Amino acid sequence: MNNMNKRTFLSLLLCVCCLSFLHAERVDMQQAGADVQGRKLNTALINSTIDRLNAHGGGTLFFPAGTYLTGSIHMKSNITLELEAGATLKFSENFDDFLPYVEVRHEGIMMKSFQPLIYAVDAENITIKGEGTLDGQGKAWWTEFFRVLVDLRDNG
């Protein structure tokens, strides 16, 4: 291959690579139908959008200002969660929204437990960015933790 052909080939390859990055879809979750008042669970919509974007090579879920109630978010490769200032991903206080149990590691020990708030297995190139808030609603989880401790102490 002469120098002219090599340069032409490399130029075309560079253009194709650049176009694939430019084509990555960005989905506005409010426009996609998500409830922004924090009253309705958005888990199914968020996870199905992630699945669809992943099937097409990746993309961004954009959350404009609002409150998005959700259970466990299942991240896949080449997905970005972008939270605008004023956007809150508010994770459910209903423990059933984090079932079925999955295998997780806690202090070096593998075990079955609730799905994490944001969960990924065999995924790469995952990004969470923006000035928004991730609200894990920790009080509900800590209340349950201490209830179980008291139950174990009192009942063995």
Protein language model regions, located:
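Bacterial Sec-dependent N-terminal signal peptides
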Residues: 1-27
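Extracellular/periplasmic carbohydrate-active domains that bind, remodel
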Residues: 17, 21-156
